Each structure stands twice: as C-alpha cells, then as structure tokens.
Amino acid sequence: MISKCYADAVDDQFQQICSGSTLPSQSVRQLVESGFVVIPGPVSGDLFDELTTAYNEVMAVAAGPDFTIASTTTRVSDLLTYASVFDDVYLYPPLLEACNHIIREPFKLSSFLARTLRGGTPAQELHADLARGSEDAPLLGFILMIDSFRVENGATRFVPTSHNWTDLPCDRLSDARAKYSGEVLGCGERGTMIIFNGAIWHGHTANVTPDSRRSIQGYFVRRSARSGFDFRNRLLPAARSRISPLARYLLALDDETQ
C-alpha cells in the first residue's frame, strides 16, 4: 500500500508539470496530430560541451550488462549513474509537458540511454516501440542529438499520423527498411530534441558516412506500466544523493513497484 503522504507528493509533482507552459502550442499540436515534433533541446554552449564530453567518457569506460554492442549501434543503459549533466535532459520542462499531453496521467521515466549509431550502417526497419493494444501504452519517446542528425548520417525517419493506425510495418511492408512514401526525417543541429509518440512508425536511416552519430534516448510511461530500466534498485547511492525531488518522482525511486 502506498502511503497517502507519498501519493499526495506524487500528485503535487504531476500537477506542477501540468501547470507548465514552456512547450509552444504549435509543437503540442504537431506532436498530437503528426506523432512527433522537433524542438530546441535543454542544454547549449559550455554545458552542451560538458554533456558531450561526459557522453564520450561513458562510452569509453562502460562495461557489463548495461553496455551493449549491437549490429549497428553501441548502447549504455545505466547512463544516469555516471554524471549529473545528464539529469538536465529528462528534467527538461517542455519534454515533461509533452508527456502530459500524450500520457495524460502521472508518469515515470522508463529508460534513459546513450546510443551511438556507427558509420557505414544500413537503415533500420520501420517499427513502433509498442505493439498495438499494449497494456503499457501510451509511451512518449525522446532523442537528444549529440551530433547533428542529417540525411546522410542516419537521421531518424517518421511516418506522420501512423501512431493512429491499427497495424504495424511488419503487417503491411515486405521490406521495412525501404523508403516509405510520406516519411519525414527528423533532422537538426547538435543539441536539438525529437519528441515522439511511441506508437508512431519510425527508424533510423542508413548512416552512409564513416563517422558515428551519437544521441541520448529515453521513454516515459504511465506510473503503473512496466519500466524498461529499474532505477529504483539499480541507481547507485552517489547518483541518488544528487537528484532533486522532481527527479526522484520521475525515476519512481519511492514507488513500491517498477
């Protein structure tokens, strides 16, 4: 049983997020109607340089089960363990307000990871991050561009309004890697953020350059939904000691279940 005091605190945090107005109405409209939006990110200048340096350091030292080298990407899933500069990403007010518009009830951070797309890699298959009718829906995803996202280096493509469709790419397409009519690339300069409905059809395009393309990615879900990463039991004491009450709420550190 969650105590009334804790429940009141959670509700208060959610109400404060709901009262925000930092995400422009046109961005809200595009997110709701098209399924994704590209906006300025949370950090710039020297702080962004600090974030980039921290990202590179993490990728250089990460090891163990939270460090994954896949066919086209290299990922670190316990990113929040390493540096406080990463906190600014998931605490970004426009991002939290976007969560309110899509999830529409108290929510939590489900995953937060570093993801490097290596050079010379093929396009990813179009996909949605949740099966249609999933009990964990809705899901709000975000991508912070550590490097610029361009046509040639694997920018993420989205199929506008596909978050409203009842089928998935695998139900309709014989080649989910092929270009899809009407797809739109989420391009931007370093520091730009993409926010998207997890139900939208999307996937990175081919990185035909020799250079890697770096990003920070994550997802928010309802507080009662399953989490992709168990922050409550996995976040180290040093990281716990630095975070704010809002961060504790978003990481669900005081919830009884994840």
Could you say what each language-model-derived stretch is?
Residues 1-34, 40-128, 132-133, 245-249:
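Non-heme Fe(II)-dependent double-stranded beta-helix
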Residues 38-39, 142, 194-196:
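Short hydrophobic-aromatic micro-motifs
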Residues 2-3, 165-258:
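Conserved double-stranded beta-helix
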Residues 41, 161, 220:
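Active-site donor-binding loop signature of nucleotide-sugar glycosyltransferases
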Residues 111-114, 142-144, 216-220:
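A structural signal for short, well-ordered beta-strand segments
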Residues 35-36, 191:
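Catalytic palm active-site di-aspartate
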Residues 120-187, 225-234:
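Catalytic core of non-heme Fe(II) oxygenases with the double-stranded beta-helix
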